[in-house]
Each structure stands twice: as structure tokens, then as C-alpha cells.
């Protein structure tokens, strides 16, 4: 009887461990030495694009670099954007068809928080959004400065997207209530803005 119980315990532990592992996606390290266009060229070429190729996904290396650009940890141990009083209290979530993921910058990984496909909550009356393979949601608990921090992050992503031939746009026409629920935000946290990313159609 004891052997049966022990075997069942081990099996449950292993299954639980596999489930936990499946909920974490380790990201490749960003390539910080790749040659990219000069900053002034990127600023000059930056634009918002509202047409996405739904059949062309974003690879893991590019995903990692997008997230690092938005709110990663730099060589000083700080973030890639400045935050007032070094609060660093912004959160970045990734929405994909396979669920909702939280970007853990310190461990350079995505952590799944839900199997739900929340992309429809970002589309509202703009159907083109559904074609983007990657969606970033910026959230914060700072009503006064959170929008500033998100603006710095999505501008970084704009410039990276321009350098890599990606399409992106900033949007505020989303279902804030449903996203708040789906992202499992605390009462003092709120959704700031949505940034779909992909390749232009």
C-alpha cells in the first residue's frame, strides 16, 4: 500500500513539474551586437502600420529582442527605459493565440498566466488587429507616471520594429475591463495601451 501511494505521489509530482515547465518559455538572449541602422535613420523612418500578415509569425529571437527593447534589463542592471524614481512598476504582457504570458525580464522568460486567447479583447471594432501574431499589453499601478513609462517602452519597440522590418501601431481602443480580468491584474493595476506587432501585409 505504501509503495502504491509513493508511486502515485512521484507520478503526480512529475506531471505537475511538466505542467509547470510548459507554462514557462525561456527566451534566447538578445543579440546586442547586431548591426542596425543609425538612430536618426530609424526616427526618420518610424511609422504606424495597420496591416499585418497573419501567416508570417515572429520567431523566438525576434520576440526576445522586442521584449528586451520594451522593458528588459540592461548592462547596468537597470531597465531599457527610465522610470521615475526607478519604480520599474510597469508590467508587459504578451497575448498570442496560445494564451496570455507575463514577461519576466529578470529571468528573460515568459510565464503563462492563462490559456485564454485574449486577442479579441484588443480588436474591438478594428478587425485588422486580429491578424497580428504578437500583442503587447502595457500595465501599471501608477496612475500619474505609468503612461509616461509605457510611452518610453512602446517607442523603443517602434524603433526596433523599424530596424527589423516589422509593422506595429499603438492602440487605445480595447476592452479594458475584459483585459483587466484576463490579465488577472490587481485592483490598483490598470491597462495602459496595446501594441500589436507583426510583418506588414
Task: Pin down the residues of each PLM region.
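Small-aliphatic-rich amphipathic alpha-helix that forms the alpha element of a beta-alpha
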Residues: 46, 66, 92, 134-136, ...
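Positively charged n-region of N-terminal signal peptides that target proteins for export
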Residues: 1-7
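N-terminal amphipathic, basic helical "cap/leader" segment at the start of enzyme domains
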Residues: 22-132
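Solvent-exposed loop/turn segments at secondary-structure junctions
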Residues: 72-74, 99-100, 142-144, 176, ...
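A glycine-rich helix N-cap at a beta->alpha junction
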Residues: 184-201
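Bacterial N-terminal signal peptides
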Residues: 7-17
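Short beta-strand element of the conserved SAM-dependent methyltransferase core
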Residues: 52, 138, 195-199
